[in-house]
Amino acid sequence: MPKRTDIETILVIGSGPIVIGQAAEFDYAGTQACLSLKEEGYRVILINSNPATIMTDTEIADKVYIEPISLDFVSRILRKERPDAILPTLGGQTGLNMAIELDKSGILDELGIEILGTKLDAIHKAEDRDLFRNLMYELGAPVPESDIIHSLDEAKRFVVKIGYPVIVRPAFTLGGTGGGICYNDQDLEEIVTSGLKYSPVTQCLLEKSIAGYKEIEYEVMRDAVDNAIVVCNMENVDPVGIHTGDSIVVAPTQTLSDRENQMLRNISLDIIRALKIEGGCNVQLALDPYSFNYYVIEVNPRVSRSSALASKATGYPIAKLAAKIAVGLTLDEIKNPVTGSTYACFEPALDYIVAKIPRWPFDKFESAKRNLGTQMKATGEVMALGRTFEEAMLKAVRSLETGQVHLELKHAEDNSDSWIEKRIRKAGDERLFFIGEALRRGVTIEQIHEWSAIDLFFLNKFKNIVDMEQTLADHKNDKEVLRTAKRLGFADKKIAELWDTTEEAIYAYRKEQGIIPVYKMVDTCAAEFESETPYFYGTYEEENESIKSEKPSVVVLGSGPIRIGQGVEFDYATVHSVWAIQEAGYEAIIINSNPETVSTDFSISDKLYFEPLTIEDVMHIIDLEQPIGVVVQFGGQTAINLADKLAANGVKILGTSLEDIDRAENRDKFEQALRDLNIPQPQGETAVSTVEALAIGERLGFPVLVRPSYVLGGRAMEIVYNQEELQHYMENAVEASPDHPVLVDRYLTGQEIEVDAICDGEHVLIPGIMEHIERAGVHSGDSISVYPPQKLTQYQKDTLVDYTTRLAKGLGIVGLMNIQYVISQGEVYVIEVNPRSSRTVPFLSKITNIPMANIATKAILGKSIVEQGYPTGLAPEQKGVFVKVPVFSFAKLRRVDITLGPEMKSTGEVMGKDATLEKALYKGLVAAGMEIRTEGTVLFTVSDKDKEEAIALAKRFSTVGYRIVATEGTAKAFEAAGVRTDVVGKIGAKGQTLIDLIQNGEAQLVVNTLTKGKQPARDGFRIRRESVENGVPCLTSLDTAEAMVRVIESMTFTAEEMPKAEVVH
């Protein structure tokens, strides 16, 4: 069937902001799909609320709407654009749920709009737990004993029948939100209640737990004429019971016999055919390790996290082909873009092993529960390729950037044997490293298997790694042993430790002995056909397949796995930088380790190396490619941190020089630079010990802001209010960087301003100034930011432009820079300068139409801003108002305090744009998932220092018709100021307490400002967590609450009594 000609315009629904469970893989899928549809000649309209992605660039679709993905806004766009069809299966769970809502509302029938790709009834059959079960019975596919429940009583009846443990899976949710494994009645009550709350249809599936089975996934594709193929099969190293997004995964499957593989493969193909899915689909199965029994766990009828992994693991572009299938093309008509000669109906074959390890945010959230279950907690993932399981695994560990280069714990000796057993029995983010330690202590693989249910095959491979450590230690300087160790993926750093020498010495010795990696091509067909993909991984074998090109090349370092503080914004900048390098006539080479992103799509760069971002792995590539230089400013802190080691190896750093990067990042040098330039900054000093820090605190006066130098996303940054808190901080957090001192600053309250600029060495271009709604002290990534600024005077704007221009030139910036200012009592102070691309670059580039990463890259390559045809100074302000609103994933992380502070906590962002600030804020808040009601109840619990401000807010809430509720102290203050307030009991009081109020859904909004101290057991913490678990918006900054009330005021009509005439005597 050739492609359809009866449709012209297609609306693609994006996946919205990045949250845990739905990350950059959908930006990748959506970008691929839009380009793929345009390639076939369709007119593509995109709606997505996320400004940080490549997908929402105007080149990707014919029309791009950055608007909330809500029934209201999507319907408006449908009415305005009248597309012929919509394609929802590439926008993750957001896209699917939106399609179902649109269908229910009747607008699709009314406008005659068709749904492309997988049909709605197939989506229902896969997502609705009841329909899915019935379909499996018809196919004769076994599913675990289960029951659909709508209330806690039904759940209890089911458990009486089959006993514990049971798994709870809420319907139509993402990343297992609200689900979990129950071992007893208490778990059941907690998890079922939360599951019913998070399911949009209040429905959960309870099933008999088959934890301990092998978890196998098949990524399959089918077209409209029933051709179906398996693109990739994958095996979770962790057994069933851990969400696949939190599992370590290998491809292809390692421990299945041919019979098992064929059996599971056939059922996967039967399922996709029975569901009549057109496009990609992911089938998860559980296999009993001791027999041929298996169960079908679930089916995702859409492009998913696993399909992004499968695409990168095999080189087979699933999303691109799914889009073509959606418009009627068939697998035997579509050329495989990798080989350029075979068709898409050939199943990929792998002659290497792929390992994926999730990246968790626990380094940012110390108080979070670290155990893993059916609810996903990872923010991102890394992938590595190798010729042996050991090599792929160790390369993946190095890619995580958690400071580990090997299968070992930090401070392993502090762990008792019983603690190690406990951490292996209960899955957690460090289980892999605990297994390594257990093997070193002589625990047998059979014993570890009994504790963890991880297959002996994998444990044996981990044992090979541990045995090799001993062999290396026994054979110092033996080059054959060295060669074997490198084949198992050992890092030079680890070998150096075992041989009592330095990493550099090992690297030099290997080069001299000719023990260097070769680069193999990822070609989808195990080298059966000629292939033209420039996609490589390194391994220690004979033949090198990566040929250095004739053209001069530039290497761009990517930003590694997505984590809090370093999100998809940096990938955006990386991709734009690559395009600019190509436009300037050079060959662009990318090194990155993240399978979810656009930058690791082989069609983006001239060459893609899928390797860890460590000095060893990067130097190998540079030795081979001999580029004219390396660009480090787009890869976030990951790339900046490699700069000094690269320069020490004689590599040219393009753009801002290493000395100048250091002048911006090193505190003492930075302060000196500001003094030379005569630019004011908050008073501050540097401490290298606790004693010194306490003395500085005394001198400056509290509160002070403390942080280590050289960190991203405000890691280990805190505002402390007294000596005890400062001492606690110095003793617990400063390990964040032992070689670097700690900065102690006077904490200025005031408005925070952020400026991005581009400098070519002599000219400075400032695309825009952004104003934060939350006052200084909230991390810039967690603040709502507004463009153009609404409150600045002309004098302040001029001062900001002047300081920014002087800083850019004075610090020798070439390329991008980001500066944060605070305006305290009318004066402008500099807080910090980042000599690199920042997380506001995509947002600013889109709203000002100044392609910042592109201009900066060309400036780095020697073409001035003026030569590129851009003006200097502050660009003229755009019409309208644009806001960037942070999005958090607190519902996924139990026990994390949601208070905003100097340490970043948001995982993603959305944009709202409109004619006025209030309208833009409304869209931003709605897109970020807040429900804004024009009436309801607002609960205030504020600290004494905030009472004054809170009274003014309470008055405004009351005027628009909200009921005000507060605890006794606050209520008294409100009443005294003339605000009608209902009193509610504190936690633990008799009668109705505020926790009851939140749990019963009586509050639509909670305003809770910090009570001092970071102790989680505090009442404030309980209130904030209860709000999150009950889906009530909780604002921890009065500035955000003020923004919210402005929006509500702008939506409501007033009802004021007539003024009385004054009596005249």
UniProtKB/Swiss-Prot annotation:
<dbReference type="GO" id="GO:0005737">
    <property type="term" value="C:cytoplasm"/>
</dbReference>
<comment type="subunit">
    <text>Composed of two chains; the small (or glutamine) chain promotes the hydrolysis of glutamine to ammonia, which is used by the large (or ammonia) chain to synthesize carbamoyl phosphate. Tetramer of heterodimers (alpha,beta)4.</text>
</comment>
<feature type="binding site">
    <location>
        <position position="298"/>
    </location>
    <ligand>
        <name>Mn(2+) 1</name>
    </ligand>
</feature>
<dbReference type="GO" id="GO:0006541">
    <property type="term" value="P:glutamine metabolic process"/>
</dbReference>
<feature type="binding site">
    <location>
        <position position="820"/>
    </location>
    <ligand>
        <name>Mn(2+) 3</name>
    </ligand>
</feature>
<keyword id="KW-0677">Repeat</keyword>
<feature type="binding site">
    <location>
        <position position="284"/>
    </location>
    <ligand>
        <name>Mg(2+) 1</name>
    </ligand>
</feature>
<feature type="binding site">
    <location>
        <position position="832"/>
    </location>
    <ligand>
        <name>Mg(2+) 4</name>
    </ligand>
</feature>
<dbReference type="InterPro" id="IPR036897">
    <property type="entry name" value="CarbamoylP_synth_lsu_oligo_sf"/>
</dbReference>
<comment type="pathway">
    <text>Amino-acid biosynthesis; L-arginine biosynthesis; carbamoyl phosphate from bicarbonate: step 1/1.</text>
</comment>
<dbReference type="GO" id="GO:0006526">
    <property type="term" value="P:L-arginine biosynthetic process"/>
</dbReference>
<dbReference type="GO" id="GO:0046872">
    <property type="term" value="F:metal ion binding"/>
</dbReference>
<dbReference type="Pfam" id="PF02787">
    <property type="entry name" value="CPSase_L_D3"/>
</dbReference>
<dbReference type="InterPro" id="IPR013815">
    <property type="entry name" value="ATP_grasp_subdomain_1"/>
</dbReference>
<feature type="binding site">
    <location>
        <position position="832"/>
    </location>
    <ligand>
        <name>ATP 2</name>
    </ligand>
</feature>
<dbReference type="Pfam" id="PF02142">
    <property type="entry name" value="MGS"/>
</dbReference>
<feature type="binding site">
    <location>
        <position position="284"/>
    </location>
    <ligand>
        <name>Mn(2+) 1</name>
    </ligand>
</feature>
<feature type="binding site">
    <location>
        <position position="210"/>
    </location>
    <ligand>
        <name>ATP 1</name>
    </ligand>
</feature>
<comment type="similarity">
    <text>Belongs to the CarB family.</text>
</comment>
<feature type="binding site">
    <location>
        <position position="175"/>
    </location>
    <ligand>
        <name>ATP 1</name>
    </ligand>
</feature>
<feature type="region of interest" description="Carboxyphosphate synthetic domain">
    <location>
        <begin position="1"/>
        <end position="401"/>
    </location>
</feature>
<dbReference type="GO" id="GO:0004087">
    <property type="term" value="F:carbamoyl-phosphate synthase (ammonia) activity"/>
</dbReference>
<feature type="binding site">
    <location>
        <position position="778"/>
    </location>
    <ligand>
        <name>ATP 2</name>
    </ligand>
</feature>
<feature type="binding site">
    <location>
        <position position="820"/>
    </location>
    <ligand>
        <name>ATP 2</name>
    </ligand>
</feature>
<feature type="binding site">
    <location>
        <position position="820"/>
    </location>
    <ligand>
        <name>Mg(2+) 3</name>
    </ligand>
</feature>
<feature type="binding site">
    <location>
        <position position="284"/>
    </location>
    <ligand>
        <name>ATP 1</name>
    </ligand>
</feature>
<feature type="binding site">
    <location>
        <position position="832"/>
    </location>
    <ligand>
        <name>Mn(2+) 3</name>
    </ligand>
</feature>
<feature type="binding site">
    <location>
        <position position="243"/>
    </location>
    <ligand>
        <name>ATP 1</name>
    </ligand>
</feature>
<feature type="binding site">
    <location>
        <position position="748"/>
    </location>
    <ligand>
        <name>ATP 2</name>
    </ligand>
</feature>
<feature type="binding site">
    <location>
        <position position="242"/>
    </location>
    <ligand>
        <name>ATP 1</name>
    </ligand>
</feature>
<keyword id="KW-0460">Magnesium</keyword>
<keyword id="KW-0547">Nucleotide-binding</keyword>
<dbReference type="GO" id="GO:0044205">
    <property type="term" value="P:'de novo' UMP biosynthetic process"/>
</dbReference>
<feature type="binding site">
    <location>
        <position position="176"/>
    </location>
    <ligand>
        <name>ATP 1</name>
    </ligand>
</feature>
<keyword id="KW-0067">ATP-binding</keyword>
<dbReference type="InterPro" id="IPR005483">
    <property type="entry name" value="CbamoylP_synth_lsu_CPSase_dom"/>
</dbReference>
<feature type="region of interest" description="Allosteric domain">
    <location>
        <begin position="930"/>
        <end position="1065"/>
    </location>
</feature>
<feature type="binding site">
    <location>
        <position position="777"/>
    </location>
    <ligand>
        <name>ATP 2</name>
    </ligand>
</feature>
<comment type="pathway">
    <text>Pyrimidine metabolism; UMP biosynthesis via de novo pathway; (S)-dihydroorotate from bicarbonate: step 1/3.</text>
</comment>
<feature type="binding site">
    <location>
        <position position="215"/>
    </location>
    <ligand>
        <name>ATP 1</name>
    </ligand>
</feature>
<feature type="binding site">
    <location>
        <position position="746"/>
    </location>
    <ligand>
        <name>ATP 2</name>
    </ligand>
</feature>
<feature type="region of interest" description="Oligomerization domain">
    <location>
        <begin position="402"/>
        <end position="546"/>
    </location>
</feature>
